[in-house]
């Protein structure tokens, strides 16, 4: 899978094709993060074939739809449990991100894993994504923003104006 652009969250439901032995096969639902619905269906078959004796040729997709965020204007903390294949083996990992949407946090995770661990998108498997309360956060990178009186430093900038003289009688004001 190529994690191109912002990933979207899809709910994919599939099952085995009905046979004379099993008229109503069980449905399997997955939460897939992918750039589009075609990749989401492909990832569904990849994961389901690892878990159950199911293949695309002997199964069908019952439903594939995009899941939209309930509150996309509120900043939330997300905990992501994942496994990834590195050059030395398979590792489990727990990461925390702060974002507006679940899909945004997962996209951030894919970018971060590529930057920090050189892990490509195809070697990362997202196991669980959960919104977590501020008190349950463990990572200092996320916890630093949980201050109600948070302040950000104003940069001390020297603006060189194009059409003003270099030498003048008054000192410049560089505090904005």
Curated annotation (Swiss-Prot):
Assembly and oligomerization: Component of the large ribosomal subunit. Binds IPO9 with high affinity.
Residues bearing the modification Phosphoserine: 71, 123
Family affiliation: Belongs to the eukaryotic ribosomal protein eL20 family.
Name of this chain's protein: Large ribosomal subunit protein eL20
A GO MF term: structural constituent of ribosome
Cytoplasm in keyword set: yes
Any one Pfam family match given in the protein's UniProt record, by short name: Ribosomal_L18A
A GO biological-process term: cytoplasmic translation
Keyword Cytoplasm attached: yes
Compartment annotation: Cytoplasm
Keywords, in A-Z order: Cytoplasm, Isopeptide bond, Phosphoprotein, Ribonucleoprotein, Ribosomal protein, Ubl conjugation
Cross-link (Glycyl lysine isopeptide (Lys-Gly) (interchain with G-Cter in SUMO2)): 11, 128, 170
GO cellular component terms, A-Z: cytoplasm; cytosolic large ribosomal subunit; cytosolic ribosome; postsynaptic density; ribosome; synapse
Gene source species: Rattus norvegicus
Modification type Phosphotyrosine: residues: 63
Record PTM N6-succinyllysine, positions in chain: 76
Biological role stated in the UniProt entry: Component of the large ribosomal subunit. The ribosome is a large ribonucleoprotein complex responsible for the synthesis of proteins in the cell.
